[in-house]
Amino acid sequence: QWPRPTPQIPP
């Protein structure tokens, strides 16, 4: 399984 990208939380 490919590592899932970390969701970027807007500031």
UniProtKB/Swiss-Prot annotation:
Give the record's family classification. Answer: Belongs to the bradykinin-potentiating peptide family.
Biological process (GO) annotations held by this record are:
regulation of blood pressure
Q: What is the lineage of its organism?
A: Eukaryota, Metazoa, Chordata, Craniata, Vertebrata
Main site of residence?
Answer: secreted
Question: Which key words are in the record?
Answer: Hypotensive agent, Metalloenzyme inhibitor, Metalloprotease inhibitor, Protease inhibitor, Pyrrolidone carboxylic acid, Secreted, Toxin
Q: Which positions does the record annotate as the modified residue Pyrrolidone carboxylic acid?
A: Q1
Q: What is this protein called?
A: Bradykinin-potentiating peptide 11
Job of this protein: This peptide both inhibits the activity of the angiotensin-converting enzyme (ACE) and enhances the action of bradykinin by inhibiting the peptidases that inactivate it. It acts as an indirect hypotensive agent.
- Compartment list: Secreted
Per the record, its GO cellular-component terms are: extracellular region
Q: In which tissues is it expressed?
A: Expressed by the venom gland.
Q: What does the record give under GO molecular function?
A: peptidase inhibitor activity; toxin activity
Q: Give the top-rank taxon of the lineage listed in the UniProt record for this protein.
A: Eukaryota
Signal sequence extent: none
